[in-house]
Structure formats: C-alpha cells, structure tokens
A protein has these predicted regions:
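Conserved N-terminal entry element of GNAT/NAT acetyltransferase domains
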Residues: 1-16
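Conserved beta-strand in the GNAT
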Residues: 53-55, 62-72, 83, 88
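A conserved beta-turn-beta hairpin within the catalytic core of GNAT-like acetyltransferases
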Residues: 72-84, 94, 113, 143
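Conserved hydrophobic beta-strand within the GNAT/NAT acetyltransferase core sheet
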Residues: 87, 118-121
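Conserved acetyl-CoA pyrophosphate-binding loop and the N-cap/start of the following alpha-helix
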Residues: 92-93, 97-105
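Conserved active-site alpha-helix within GNAT-family acetyltransferase domains
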Residues: 112-116, 123-146
Length: 152
C-alpha cells in the first residue's frame, strides 16, 4: 500500500474512486451520478486547483482507500473554508485502519501546503475522529442526514 496524490493522468484510479464513491453513497444526491463524480474528481486533482485527491492503492494499482481535501464543501459554517471529504475504504480493505492512516497522511500533506483548520462532517464516525484529534463544532442536517461538523 502506498500514498498517492492523484493527478488527472491517473485515469484508472479516478475510475475506481468514482465507482467506489457511487457504489457506497449513490442514495445521496452528490453521489447518484457517476459521471458527475468523475468530473468533480478530475477537476479536484487538476494542477491549477489547490484541492487534493488522495488514495492508497495496492501494488497492482487497485484502490484501497480514498480521501480528499475540498474547498468550500459546506456553506454556512463559520470560517470553514477547507474540508476533509469523500473518505472511503473499499469493503475488502476495511478493518485494517487504512482510512485512519490515509486521513493522517492527507492531513499532514494538507497542513504543510495550506496550514488552515480542516473541517469534516460525519453522521456516524464521531468517536473515531475524536480519537484522531478532531473537535466537534456543530450538529446540522446535510443531504437529509443528521451530521456532526468537526474541526482540526
């Protein structure tokens, strides 16, 4: 497994990430259209965009986990410019702390480049993120789900 900052040339990874996000969350509006996901990911990893699309892949280039830093993902959260989002470990790779390791690696990469607070929202992983140093900011509804907004 190795950390990858995805570029537009990583077409196989972009396809795998798009498919994994769509499969996991297709019941929610931002992930119901795989073509829209693909375009969003290509834009996110373009050279003139400060956002980061990252992943872990195995030695054969198969996706294990993905996470991104996203500019302005949610509006209305005071001073929340940068967000950690689209964090997903593929089902076959779960249970090995890959998601947590990827988040830490991406956070360090982001912090070295940008240095501002990073936010996230989660409906059900608050305890995990608290153990990783994230602090609760507020509760709100996002995509028809009750979520906790957190900051680090």
């Amino acid at each position: 497994m190795h950390f990858i900052v995805v570029t537009p040339q990583d077409t196989q990874l972009i396809e795998q990430i798009s498919s994994a996000l769509h499969h996991e969350w297709r019941h929610l509006p931002p992930w119901e259209n795989i073509s829209a996901i693909r375009m969003r990911l290509i834009e996110r990893c373009s050279h003139d965009n400060p956002q980061i699309l990252s992943c872990y892949a195995d030695k054969n280039g198969n996706l294990l986990a993905t996470a991104s830093t996203i500019l302005h993902e949610l509006t209305g959260v005071h001073q929340a410019t940068w967000w950690l989002g689209e964090v997903l470990t593929v089902p076959e790779a779960r249970g090995h702390k890959m998601g947590s390791k990827l988040i830490e690696e991406l956070y360090n990469c982001y912090h070295n480049l940008i240095g501002q607070s990073l936010y996230l929202y989660t409906p059900d992983m608050q305890q995990l993120y608290r153990r990783m140093g994230w602090k609760d900011v507020e509760e709100r509804i996002v995509n028809h789900e009750q979520v906790t907004v957190m900051k680090r």
